[in-house]
UniProtKB/Swiss-Prot annotation:
NAD listed as a keyword: yes
Transmembrane segments: 4-24, 30-50, 61-81
InterPro entries: NADH_UbQ_OxRdtase_chain4L/K (IPR001133), NUOK/Mnh_C1-like (IPR039428)
Protein name listed in UniProt: NADH-quinone oxidoreductase subunit K
């Protein structure tokens, strides 16, 4: 039987993997976006675990809102990346530090 602690450890591991992904790979924007999405999924895992543990559905409902915002963020982020790649031929973070009007 899985307890609340198992789900919280899983969420902590997923969150730690996402943090490591951001700090180890600061050059590729796609990896950074994927790491942020993994962070949000770790938080959603904790929301569902606490919601199930407390017998309340508010945490599960909140997960739908977080997933909606995460999907919109991913779509907008990837659209911006495609535009930047077409203009600059790179997606490295170090090359995207200049703003041009």
């Amino acid at each position: 039987m899985l307890t609340l602690a198992h789900y919280l450890v899983l969420g902590a591991i997923l969150f730690a993997i996402a943090i490591v992904g951001i700090f180890l790979n600061r050059r590729n924007v796609i990896i950074i976006l994927m790491s942020i999405e993994l962070m949000l999924l770790a938080v959603n895992t904790n929301f569902v675990a606490f919601s199930h543990y407390l017998g309340d559905v508010h945490g599960q409902i909140f997960v739908f809102f977080v997933l909606t915002v995460a999907a919109a963020e991913a779509a907008i982020g990837l659209a911006i990346l495609v535009t930047l790649f077409r203009k600059l031929d790179t997606i490295n973070v170090e090359d995207l530090d200049q703003l041009k009007g």
